[in-house]
């Protein structure tokens, strides 16, 4: 399995900027039914991330997202192998990686995306190709 991050990442991502309000991010998550919102600068470079867990605490709705976002973000190039992403998530105990190309945000990869890959791989392994009569005859000779 030589799957790249690019093959699994979500590219249709919703982002926001640091000066937007926490309420804005809450509304995005609720409307889009997502659990994280990357925060980007004007050059579309990731500068933070807000997750649903960050929003559990009580904040005034007008508080800028820059005050609660995780600034210690983890990024991975889109052409990296998926096993590197999985190892990063496990070692850092995180559930989201921001995917970049030349420092620009191009996608997001979640632990759920990795689980889907494992599930699909297991399905393929449980359903190997069956032998046909021609294949069986060739094997005997």
Per-range role (PLM):
Residues 2-13, 62-73:
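Bateman (tandem CBS) regulatory domains
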Residues 7, 21-24, 38, 51-55, ...:
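Histidine- and aromatic-rich ligand-binding microenvironments
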Residues 15-33, 40, 76-93, 99-101, ...:
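The conserved cystathionine-beta-synthase
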Residues 48-53, 95, 100, 107-115:
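Short hydrophobic beta-strand motif reused across regulatory alpha/beta modules
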Residues 78, 104-141:
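Cytosolic regulatory modules rich in charged/polar residues
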Residues 57-63, 123:
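Short, charge-rich, low-complexity interaction segments located
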């Amino acid at each position: 399995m030589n799957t790249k991050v690019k093959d699994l990442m979500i590219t249709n991502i919703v982002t926001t900027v640091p000066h937007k309000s926490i309420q804005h991010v809450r509304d995005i998550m609720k409307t889009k039914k997502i659990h994280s919102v990357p925060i980007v600068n004007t050059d579309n470079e990731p500068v933070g991330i807000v997750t649903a867990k960050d929003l559990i605490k009580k904040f005034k709705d007008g508080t800028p997202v820059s005050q609660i976002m995780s600034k210690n973000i983890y990024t991975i190039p889109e052409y990296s192998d998926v096993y590197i992403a999985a190892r990063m998530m496990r070692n850092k105990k995180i559930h989201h990686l921001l995917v970049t190309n030349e420092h620009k945000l191009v996608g997001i990869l979640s632990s759920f995306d990795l689980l889907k890959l494992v599930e699909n791989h297991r399905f393929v392994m449980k359903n190997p190709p069956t032998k046909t009569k021609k294949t069986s005859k060739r094997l005997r000779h």
